[in-house]
Amino acid sequence: MKIVIVGIGYVGLANAILFSKNNENEVVLLDIDENKIQSINNHKSPIKDKLIEKFFVQNISKLHATSNIKEAYFNADFAVIATPTDYDEQLNFFDTRSIENVLKDIKNINSKINVIIKSTVPIGYTKTIKQKFNMSNIVFSPEFLREGSALYDSLYPSRIIIGDKSVLGKTIGDLFLKNIEKKNVDIFYMDSDEAESVKLFSNTYLAMRVGFFNEVDSYARKHNLNSADIIKGISADDRIGKYYNNPSFGYGGYCLPKDTKQLLANFYNIPNSLIKAIVETNEIRKKFITQLILEKKPNILGIYRLIMKQNSDNFRNSVIIDIIKYLQEYNSNIELIIYEPLVKEKKFLNIKVENDFNVFGAKVDLIIANRFDDKLKEIKDKVFSADVFYTDI
């Protein structure tokens, strides 16, 4: 069986490895990024994920990547679309053009391929494109992967959602069940609109938890209370749970900001209060944190890491970047220095980058860190962070 994975991000790569572990499958990765293609063909992971990196060490010739669409789609049985769908602030909608471009190629080259969409899409999207392209062989199956743990979450999924109740949906469900490691996983077959809803509502619930515990922390800070003690007491209730409860500067990253905004857009003309509040509370929190930082009146403020979470290899839509922008908006004269080893340039957002940590620590009188790590221990008296449990969960 030949399976094409379109998009070499953490979702695409995790799915590629999942299917390639079965020797009956031929897996081809398709992307336009020649650096990622070269990395995979040289048996190196283009993303940071311990299990994925381990796979490349142990399975030298399992995966092949290409930018040649004809080569990729020739004789393929399935295509998994895992291309980015960023949120367009002007349109108030996901930018789904990458998916449609893939579907155009598939229809022109090999229209018999069964298409599985893993990219996050608006509610109602799958039905729309099936009509637009006159293709009945398109199924939406959302992913619930964490960046940094994408392969583990693919092998041991919390559940499998298939947005199709037909024979094709059952075939795709069996395809995943045959390749995952977890036994007795729940699999749900439903309408595509419902599967799309599961994805957006799931991430919006997680964003709601982040927002809730951030507001607990905001209250505690204003009243000089210990937020860690309060949160521990709240979370000890099994109905609430001891997860996703660590305060932060706000939620960021690739999924939660865009998915909450898309769900709110899907609520157009539907009475709602909570969904809107989840989006708003994140901006309120970032502004609140910015004011707390400015109240400390630092002469030189250090920004420790731009990454969205601990051990990430990127800072796409990172909350700390929003904090920087608010700082510059509220006080244009504030002097900032960034420590971020991932940035090789001397400046970022027109701010000096200092990647000698000792020099960085000596130059600044206050350091802000969305997440605290061991590197900061020796200068912890200089650090301002909302992180009370030292975890991303």
Curated annotation (Swiss-Prot):
Keywords carried by this UniProt record: Capsule biogenesis/degradation, NAD, Oxidoreductase
EC number: 1.1.1.22
List of catalytic residues: 255
GO biological processes: capsule polysaccharide biosynthetic process; UDP-glucuronate biosynthetic process
Pathway: Nucleotide-sugar biosynthesis; UDP-alpha-D-glucuronate biosynthesis; UDP-alpha-D-glucuronate from UDP-alpha-D-glucose: step 1/1; Capsule biogenesis; capsule polysaccharide biosynthesis
GO molecular function: identical protein binding; NAD binding; protein homodimerization activity; UDP-glucose 6-dehydrogenase activity
Catalysed transformations (reactions): UDP-alpha-D-glucose + 2 NAD(+) + H2O = UDP-alpha-D-glucuronate + 2 NADH + 3 H(+)
Subunit structure: Homodimer.
The protein, known as: UDP-glucose 6-dehydrogenase
Organism the protein comes from: Campylobacter jejuni subsp. jejuni serotype O:2 (strain ATCC 700819 / NCTC 11168)
